[in-house]
């Protein structure tokens, strides 16, 4: 890297809380750190929007918060994001719109407040109950 590219990379790693890891190899980083490096790499292209497909599903539970916090920060900065997630609490807090899918089809969509407090579809209600029960058990 040289000059502007290196400055940009370091700024993005700093934004991800990883400036001190800039010269580490991938195997020296945790799963959450690797995921944040991937986000920084994508941001280097200055996209208008980003797609996150289960960005936290392969992470240890204690690392999930790191990645969700970065995504929360991007949302607060106005980044357009399409997020596929089972992290319902996060979705309720961050989303402008929620789309519920079942078997590859959209079954319900709307503002988070409506979807999470008064879903129209029985399948959505069943899914949300299962997520809430799982959370209570842990």
Task: Identify the residue ranges that each predicted region occupies.
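Conserved ABC ATPase signature
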Residues: 25-29, 33
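A short, proline-enriched helix->beta-strand linker immediately N-terminal to the Walker B motif
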Residues: 44-48
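H-loop/switch region of ABC-family ATPase nucleotide-binding domains
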Residues: 85-86
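ABC ATPase "signature
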Residues: 109-110
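A short, surface-exposed alpha-helical micro-motif characterized by mixed small hydrophobic
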Residues: 91-93
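Hydrophobic anchor residue at the start of the ABC signature
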Residues: 39
